[in-house]
Amino acid sequence: MTVSRNLAAFAALNGALAVLIGAFAAHGAGPQIKTLLTTGGHYQMVHAVLALVCAIWPGRGRLVLWAGWLSATGGLVFCLALSAVALLRLTAMGAIAPIGGGLMIAAWLLLLIAALRSQSTPA
């Protein structure tokens, strides 16, 4: 099995950041800040795991690799935008969150296309 080392490393970094943000949210954040950080951290963690799966996907093609990069990047952009709103009160950064969301949606759609194009193999 081949592994995309760079994608796996980026996914791992995203996972670590998601845990850090979740820990910060759990310890000492007010209710509104906690909600924003928890939401961002959740999406970042889910998409870090998806990116890691894409990095180690057996027989992965370009669509799966692209899905991994879009997933990790989208999760990071979404989470950082919500964190900037919550922690720095940069409300204008809230406008960037949908870009991250769009990247995450694109990642899932690329995986859908990859799955539909794949050949079935007997178990």
Where are the model-predicted features located?
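Polytopic transmembrane helical bundles with strong interfacial aromatic enrichment
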Residues: 1-123
